[in-house]
Amino acid sequence: MASDNIKSVEVINNPGARYDASVKAVIRITTKKAKGEGFGFNNRLVGFKHRFGESLYDQFNFNYREGGFDLTGMLSGGHYDNSQGAITTVDVHSANHWRVKNDMSKQKNINHILSGTLSMNYQFNPDHVMGVRYKLSRDPKIRIDGTALAEAFMDGTMYEQSDARYDIGGQFTSHDINAYYNGKVNDWSIDLNLDGMWHKTKQNQFTAQTITETSRKTMEENMTTFNRTRNNLLASKLVISRPLWDGSLSFGGEYSHNSRTNLYHNDEGVLDSDDSEIKEGMTSGFVEYGRSFGKLGVQAGVRYEHVGFDYYDRGKHIDEQSKTYDDVFPSLALSLPIGKVQTQLVYGTDISRPSYSDLRSNITYVNRYLYETGDPYLLPTRSRNLTFASSYQWLNLVLGYQHIMNDISQLCDPFPGKDPSVSLYKYANIDDYDKAFASLTLAPKVGIWQPQLTLSVQKQWYTAETPDGKAEFNRPLGSFQWQNTLQFSKTFNIGVNASFQTKGHSGNTHLDKTSGALSFSAYKSFFKGRFIAQLFAYDLLQTNRQYLTMYNGGRTVKWEIKPNRSVRLTLRYVFNQAKSKYKGTGAGQSQKARM
């Protein structure tokens, strides 16, 4: 979506019961009124250069409108280099102190992508509109290759080292379709969405490594794996609303059924093969009512979700890994102006279900010392939230408190076997904890200068397992973002933005050092907006280097993520371009995100 088609953007911190319980906020974008009939198009060319590689992307959008008929489409393709370096250090505190340093900073991640979308929309009259949209995405080439140097120390003395060369290749294909009807009959408004999705991913990995012991004795070790996943989803969503008792009543439901198959094989037989399938059906219903009592605005709702999760191993139903969930999510929002100050108090509950990748049982090989897996026994994360928001002219304040249950975090466990230097990364539910947060945003306008400063802080009350026993991870985590735009004219502006992150705790992780970034942007349009050039440079001083430590009992993992300075240039040409009238919002969105 191009910025010049946008009229306003609103962030809704209380989406209400009509949205899936995993939705914590909604961004509502209001577009400008559609232009006249005929054919139009725009083409966007994006070049991207960063420290580790280059990317090039082109997107062509077209539209045709005649009467109530609206046809829009998009074709895109590109070469993406998403390479980024990281160094990890695993400390194992057992009978001996083991330290394993993994340097994976020399890695290339290349994607070739193709995508196409076609939407058809017909407005019969102001009260009835329907449409259908199809999207094809294809990544014919996914390539990750590089070297991983690992060094193992026992009680401070070099034990052995491993030099691995890995090559991962794959493809991705997806088909997505949406059909919708949006209508009004007397006082009744109807919004119906029907969705289907079919995804397939294939991946081959080959790793060849040389292991050198302190005696200088060497040995070769190879690992070959194949992984294929398929995701299928059918979903529907119906929302009905009407005025009632000087307010607005909404109710409806959503249904989705999806299946995911995972096939994993290791040629050498070192790792167990996996042939599993997940089938999940979700049924939900909601009712929501809002009205004003004088100056007091009230919105109350409740949502019910039923999820049936079935896990199969080689076609056999596994009872202990199959689950049924029944959850009720109430929500209440009160809004009241006090003089010129707008205030809002919101209570709500939400849920975050684990991704299907996190639920996998197969073990993935990284190198001699590192393996990775999921956990089919993972429970959803739930939270109860209380939020207060206040705004006055260009000042906005948000205060909140959360009680978080069964949060999901990545832990570092010993790999099954006798070698304590080998670790297994896995996802697990951690203990319940509370968290408070606050943010203050100042956005005045001083002539051509439009600054926006956001100050945020969060503090948790969490007890973590460390090598020295239990420890309170309660150190606050602060950040600020300072955006500055100089609007010289309607056709030209520049921006200078800065961000900063403090040390602090988040879950079972400690951010060990401060980090920040300085960025620059420029926008210029020519020929009455037909040609647009945008330049964006991120992390100019290369200061966004991140250091963090993850704790899990007797094991700690230190991460060092290198800075990644980047420059992006976007060139866009527009001819009689009009925004699409397509009003389909989709169904089963939370399930799609988990895939």
Question: Which sequence ranges carry the predicted segments?
Answer:
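Outer-membrane beta-barrel signature, preferentially recognizing the C-terminal barrel domain
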Residues: 277-280, 320-323, 351-405, 423-436, ...
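Surface-exposed extracellular loop regions of Gram-negative outer-membrane beta-barrel proteins
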Residues: 31-44, 85, 89, 102, ...
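Transmembrane beta-barrel wall of Gram-negative outer-membrane proteins
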Residues: 53-85, 97-145, 173-175, 183, ...
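C-terminal beta-signal and adjacent terminal beta-strands/loops
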Residues: 526-595
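Transmembrane beta-strands of outer-membrane beta-barrel pores
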Residues: 45-49, 66, 77-81, 136-140, ...
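Face-selective signature of the C-terminal outer-membrane beta-barrel domain
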Residues: 115-139, 165-314, 337, 341-342, ...
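Outer membrane beta-barrel strand-and-loop segments of large Gram-negative receptors
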Residues: 233-237, 282-284, 379, 385, ...
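N-terminal periplasmic accessory domains that precede
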Residues: 1, 11, 21-45, 56-58
